[in-house]
Structure formats: C-alpha cells, structure tokens
C-alpha cells in the first residue's frame, strides 16, 4: 500500500519506519529542511511511561489561580483571541476530576509502556544510538504535601505493574549522587527504574536514515497546503502546484493538525508551549546521571553525554514562539538549585516548542471517519515517550492487523459527537 505521512517529527518518522517495515511504500512530506526541526528538536529528553499523566488533574484549577501570581510558575495562560482556546480550556477543566484523571492516566501509561517496549526492541534490532541512558526517572518532592499526593500516582503504577521506589531524602543520593548536597531541600522522591532518556532530535534523525534504508522517501522543504477530497475519501495532498497521491494518508503535524483537517472534522489539539535550555557539563560529580523531575516547578533535568537538558513548563498562549527571558531564568534557577556547578548555564542554548495537547492528555492515534485518513497527533509533552508505540500501533491498523494493546480509546472517535450531542462509543 502507498502511504503518505505528513510531518517528520519523531511521531511521523516513527510511523514511517514501522509502516516501511510492514512492507508499505511510504513517503514523508515536511515543510522543514530535515526531520525533528520543530517540537521534537530540543524537548526534555525523557522516555517516562510511569510519569505519563495528563496536565488535567484534580487540584490543577486552584493551582492555576495561585500560579498566576508566582514568578516561576509552571503554567501560564494568555488569551489568544480564539474561541477554540476557550473551548479547549473548558474541556480540560472537565477532565480535572479524580475519576477522569485515573482513566486518562491509565490510557497514557498503557501506550507509553508499550512504546518503551517497542523502542527497546528497535534498539536491539538496529543498534540505534542517540545518547540514551537507562537509569530511570526520579521525581523530586520539596514539600510533605507533594510527597503525600504521590499516593494517587502510585496506585495507578501498581495497577499497571510499573516498578517504583519511594525514597527518603537520605536515599535520593543512591539514584542521583549529586543530590546529596541539596537533600535538606527535599522531602523525598519517587523513582521509576524502568524509565529511559535520550536526545529525541538525534534519535529521529537516525531513525529517518534507517527508514530511508527501508525505502521511505522524505520530501523536505515541501509546502503542505491541503487535502484533496473526492468521493468521501482523500484523493491526494496538495503541495504547491503538485498533488501527491497515495492509498492512505497519515496526519502527524502536531499542533497544526487541528487547522489542517478542520474542513473534515474537529479535533481538540492545542499548542502547549514549552521551553528548554541545553548546557555543557563542567563538573561530572555535580551533574545528574539520569533524569529528575522537579514536582514544584514541573521541570525535567536530563543528562545527555556531555550536556544537561532542562525543560518543561506550559503556556496556553496559542502559536506564540517568542523566547521569554523569564522562562530561561526559571530553568536556570531550577537546575542550579538542584545541581549547582554541574553545568554552565551561561553557555546554554535556549529553545521553545509547541506540544500538541488534547484536553484529556491522551493522544489521537488511529482511524478516522474518512476511511483512508489516519491521525497520529496530540501527544502533548510525551511525543518522545509514545512515538515508537504510536508508530507501531498505526502501522498495525493500516496493515489490517490487531494491535498489541487496546487501541479503541485512543482514536479520534472519543471526541466526535452524534446528532444528539453525545460522545459516540470509541473505536479504533
């Protein structure tokens, strides 16, 4: 089957690789000059299935009000003048109940765990290198309230059989030796030994090369203008004056997926702006060995070979790509507070990206009401974590195979409404 994939971020490239491995003739189209040059370029570098959780959580609405008055707040909201933003935030608020949080987190952990398994199999098969580490993830708590609040996440981890360790301040140095110097600032930590890290942009670039060796064609610097429709199906992709035709089409355009298919269906994928800095390591003993999550500031600090990546925060501000100095100050403050002297933040590069987020946190992967149109978008802050599993799942669906995990509640159908305004039963 001929398949066209729109988008060459980590999700689009992973989709291309698994489809090519399944025997399909694949073409990837992107407006950029190469793979992973937008949202996948400088993310936090974590592959953290156990920490796959929606931003829509109990207590977040009240926290959001408090964060409005804090300098280093992890969440910021500025109205972008669109009705869509207001609708999206309303849907997100509706998902901030304990019941919906548990359902949404369960879906996310299921896909993320499967995705890590797919990544490990890919690594074993190909030997792909991307400055990866398998040292686990450590969530750090600065208050007793945060430590007590971890109970709901631990319950989900136990239900999903995800290994974890609850650490006292004195035990944190066993996972991250450099934290010994700042353990007095912390009340404990939750460690997931099965989590991994790696440079997402490097991984995507090398996976694209592997995909090319399987026959995938990459068309960069190519405008993606519109989908041509005929007879209720997609008849091609309009790229400037050219129409590219295939048997099946995959939209993996991140935050831009919403507007691109708006004439066909409405999907609630909104850009959630995040930031990162990448600093050179100057003192190995003071640097992290894997990755930590600062629960207070919602910031991840990740070790690459000779660099530290510090990323996080969320701004609901539309398609604004402005680099804000105050956000850099927060990232530098966090890493220098936990790992003083480990990296030289004065020489750090500063980046921002738009994560494609759904109100419930779960991505949209699978079939659509248009028979030859498939979606792979809405992964939010977890595109790197979920990329391989999403690509394999999509390849199975397009190939007519039964996916290895439950996929019916991951598709767009959970958001589509029937004439009575009720959500239709979800199916893949």
Swiss-Prot record:
A GO molecular-function descriptor: D-amino-acid dehydrogenase activity
Residues that coordinate or bind FAD: 3-17
UniProt cross-references to PANTHER family, sorted A to Z: D-AMINO ACID DEHYDROGENASE, SARCOSINE DEHYDROGENASE-RELATED
HAMAP family according to UniProt: DadA
Family: Belongs to the DadA oxidoreductase family.
Gene that produces this protein: dadA
GO cellular component, one term: plasma membrane
Disulfide bonds: none
UniProt cross-references to InterPro entries, sorted A to Z: DadA (IPR023080), FAD-dep_OxRdtase (IPR006076), FAD/NAD-bd_sf (IPR036188)
Function: Oxidative deamination of D-amino acids.
Catalytic activity of the protein: a D-alpha-amino acid + A + H2O = a 2-oxocarboxylate + AH2 + NH4(+)
Enzyme class: oxidoreductase
Species assigned in the record: Burkholderia lata (strain ATCC 17760 / DSM 23089 / LMG 22485 / NCIMB 9086 / R18194 / 383)
Domain of life: Bacteria
Protein name, as recorded: D-amino acid dehydrogenase
GO biological process, one term: D-alanine catabolic process
Keywords, alphabetical: FAD, Flavoprotein, Oxidoreductase
Enzyme nomenclature, EC number: 1.4.99.-
Pathway the protein takes part in: Amino-acid degradation; D-alanine degradation; NH(3) and pyruvate from D-alanine: step 1/1
Cofactor names: FAD
